[in-house]
Amino acid sequence: MKSEAKDGEEESLQTAFKKLRVDASGSIASLSVGEGTGVRAPVRTATDDTKPKTTCASKDSWHGSTRKSSRGVVRTQRRRRSKSPVLHPPKFIHCSTIASSSSSQLKHKSQTDSPDGSSGLGISSPKEFSAGESSASLDANHTGAVVEPLRTSVPRLPSESKKEDSSDATQVSQASLKASDLSDFQSVSKLNQGTPCTCIGKECQCKRWHDMEVYSFSGLQSVPPLAPERRSTLEDYSQSLHARTLSGSPRSCSEQARVFVDDVTIEDLSGYMEYYLYIPKKMSHMAEMMYT
């Protein structure tokens, strides 16, 4: 049984190999193999000589290889061997989560401006309204309603603001902005639009700019400064180390160089090396051991 199977396999190999040989005339001779096969396969000639057919055999039968046909054609990517994480650069997070009312009005304005000319000033197309209303009344009501909030929300050009009196501008901005909305730059700058900052050459009086935090860095942990008791223990440790080195026999250099380091610092160090210097975990651990 085994020998028969082997013969069959060899025959299939040879037929596959011979199928690959394309004659110059364009006919493919599929020749029979061995004496065991009784039936001779007919020789197929190309029907039209003007277009000689060149048939590409499938990849599986190249060089007589009997590869199984690949069922899943798209191969999934191999799993990463190394256990180190895929690192991404640190992100910048914008702190002002509360969108101010003015910016939302601006967004609304940009949405209402649609490409067709009828709704250029925020006038929605007359299909939405009942046919009874005349277009004139539509114009009067709708533009009057929409243009007013837009005037308050759109930041003015300097030429425009010179024309309009500054007191009116400050009143409008003061009314539209509340204390909760002062978390973004636009609103704060609008609030200070009327009167220029008076602190030139003096200590700055504009408190609102000081409280504003714009970007926070989500990378390294912000380690709080050492508490006073911790600081004192650090000083004691360094003093005792110094006294020991002076009085007793000279210690090894590594012991003299060893500094008081707590676990948090070590963790930060290793994290820094892994995530910012892209050193894999094992190596960063070794470096930690060297530093401590």
From Swiss-Prot:
One of its GO terms (cellular component) is nucleus. Residues 27-175 are annotated as: Disordered. Residues 65-83 have a biased composition (Basic residues). Keywords: Phosphoprotein. The modification Phosphothreonine is found at T143, T233. The keyword Phosphoprotein applies. It holds the Pfam family DUF776. One of its GO terms (biological process) is cellular response to hydrogen peroxide. InterPro entries: DUF776. This is Oxidative stress-responsive serine-rich protein 1.
